[in-house]
């Protein structure tokens, strides 16, 4: 037994049993990495570093695997051999475009001989871990075989649905998303189809920019889609939003429709794309600056937004269920207006999930904070209970009350309407600091002034009362999203079709 072959055996064993995947240790600082291997459940993963492994098994072509590592960092220091090359890097997605090579095949005489007693010494030491690993591998293969059998039926269904969509000239995207061709969550396309769609999207025009990056209108087989391109500093938001859309049942008329998520290389840099339905009216913030509203349209916008928030907040049980979700960055810029003049909620990059069955609160790993202008008093004075999911829902309700106020200002009553203004426009600067908002909301206990003219309309007076109940200083006294939804639906009893007043 030679030293080279002994080292190869240990390295191959480590790779074969996934010891660099980071499943056994909690990394202190996480990076996002491309994940391409049989055990990848998503096209990305998180770990302490990114890995690329090039392996050549006897009689086969070399195989490339990409993933994450959180332990066994000594493998990163190994030199390449004719069978294995293992590369580690420490920036997000640094393993996306790395190419490796194997050493030229060596003759046995080139490898130094190892002490003949070494196998006798190491044999008993290695026997137990090897047996345990082999048992684990056997169990994994059995489960993998069962999963493949289950997936076979869904894959066949997906293929037929994709062909059907290709044959129909109108609304290919609709055929994809309205069918059962999903990841199983009902939230988007299968991962391989997501990647295919992303590579077929052509960017047409930039329709928005912000601290997160840019939003483009794209074209896919003649249909418009929205492409949100995240900046490198906001990659955790992309990761979180992709994670939620791919694991949670979020198909709802009043939640922005998800299509695909992918990493692409443009101009020698990695771009993070989130592809969603395109809504030409843009955000509610943009819509309210351009349009004034009749009372019925104002209620239509409010009811639909409340329906989306209620769907996020509720936990649905069963095989097609979903955990409860709190948005944490609700504002008029993160609410879109659809062509039917209903709202849908977007941007889940800060969302928090909670499951009652496991009592697990999934906060994510995003250092970004919400928008200061829409922060609830308990967030500003740092008294929020971060270990309690209800606390996050209560902050959403505070912010939703501010969105209702923005809608109410642009509603025409007796021929009177105000210009669009953001909440607290007359109390804080255009870009308020944390301290600015804390003084106004917590110290002075101010809330936006509700227009007196709302009292002249029996329906909108109910909307005004709802705002006040969203802004109670005591978070637990605020309305729930479900109560807001039901109350608004009662107020909106008039079936007259809404109109936009220019």
Curated annotation (Swiss-Prot):
Residues covered by the Protein kinase domain: 201-502
Residues modified as Phosphoserine: 154, 159-160
State whether keyword Cell membrane applies. Answer: yes
Which sequence ranges are listed under topological domain Cytoplasmic? 141-502
Q: Which residues form the signal peptide?
A: 1-22
Which segments sit on the Extracellular face?
23-119
Where is it predominantly found?
membrane
Instruction: Report the gene name.
Output: Acvrl1
Known glycosylation sites? 32, 97
Protein's membrane topology: Single-pass type I membrane protein
Taking every annotated instance into account, which residue ranges of this chain make up the domain GS? Answer: 171-200
Family statement drawn from the similarity comment of this UniProt entry = Belongs to the protein kinase superfamily. TKL Ser/Thr protein kinase family. TGFB receptor subfamily.
List cofactor names only. Answer: Mg(2+); Mn(2+)
Q: Which PANTHER family match?
A: SERINE_THREONINE-PROTEIN KINASE RECEPTOR R3, TRANSFORMING GROWTH FACTOR-BETA RECEPTOR TYPE I AND II
Where are the active-site residues found? 329 (proton acceptor)
Q: Tell where it localizes.
A: Cell membrane
Task: List the catalysed reactions.
Answer: L-threonyl-[receptor-protein] + ATP = O-phospho-L-threonyl-[receptor-protein] + ADP + H(+); L-seryl-[receptor-protein] + ATP = O-phospho-L-seryl-[receptor-protein] + ADP + H(+)
Spell out the protein name for this chain. Activin receptor type-1-like
Alphabetic keyword roster: Angiogenesis, ATP-binding, Cell membrane, Disulfide bond, Glycoprotein, Kinase, Magnesium, Manganese, Membrane, Metal-binding, Nucleotide-binding, Phosphoprotein, Receptor, Serine/threonine-protein kinase, Signal, Transferase, Transmembrane, Transmembrane helix
* Disulphides: 33-50, 35-40, 45-68, 76-88, 89-94
Quaternary structure?
Answer: Interacts with TSC22D1/TSC-22.
Record keyword Calcium present: no
Mention one GO biological process in which this protein takes part, according to its record: positive regulation of Notch signaling pathway
